[in-house]
């Protein structure tokens, strides 16, 4: 199921379900996917089930929403300082020459590795544990808070100090930490990330 956050023709924020043909049906009583996720947790049901029950006949199209730049990011916290953009090197194994040089050195004696490379190796070796086993916390990176996330079609501004600025397509996992500190997966989205592999 594909869901989006968008601005309706009347200017109001909406959540919509996108069909295979690009038709967007508005979800009744939902203005953000964050609200939907919280409600589904409280009701102990899947977001999909809630959407199926509340999909309306009010329609829009993806083509029009994109052409008129009415699309929002798929998920956001109402307080951007409570939203974290981060990742792990384990999902970027071949994204940069720096990773390739790390792989070449992994066969060395662990005592000769830098702390960063040790963490990378620990993550490779034990970062994806079997069910009910505790794994190694993988190497990870922090990109910023919710203020760093831009809506689709929004301008990406490159810093003046960039050495090799560029964009990378990313597959993003969207997670929410609930009131009991349980991590809940909301879904996945495509993203366009600014990166600088030289700096």
Question: Where on the chain are the PLM-derived regions?
Answer:
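Gly/serine-rich nucleotide phosphate-binding loop at the start of the catalytic core
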Residues: 2-51
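Active-site microenvironments in enzyme catalytic cores
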Residues: 4-6, 38, 42-199
């Amino acid at each position: 199921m594909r869901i989006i956050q968008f601005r309706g023709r009347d200017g109001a924020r909406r959540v919509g379900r996108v069909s295979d043909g690009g038709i967007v049906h508005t979800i009744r009583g939902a203005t953000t996917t964050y609200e939907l996720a919280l409600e589904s947790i409280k009701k102990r049901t899947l977001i999909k089930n809630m959407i199926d029950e509340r999909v309306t006949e009010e329609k829009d199209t993806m083509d029009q929403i994109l052409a008129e730049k009415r699309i929002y990011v798929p998920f956001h916290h109402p307080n951007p300082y409570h939203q974290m953009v981060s990742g792990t090197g384990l999902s970027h194994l071949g994204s940069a020459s720096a990773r390739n040089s790390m792989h070449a050195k992994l066969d060395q004696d662990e005592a000769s590795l830098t702390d960063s490379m040790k963490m990378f190796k620990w993550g490779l070796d034990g970062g994806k544990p079997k069910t009910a086993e505790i794994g190694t916390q993988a190497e990870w990176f922090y990109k910023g808070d919710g203020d760093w996330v831009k809506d689709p079609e929004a301008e990406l501004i490159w810093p003046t100090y960039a050495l090799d600025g560029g964009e990378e397509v990313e597959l993003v996992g969207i997670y929410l930490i609930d009131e009991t500190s349980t991590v809940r997966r909301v879904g996945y989205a495509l993203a366009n990330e600014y990166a600088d592999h030289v700096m």
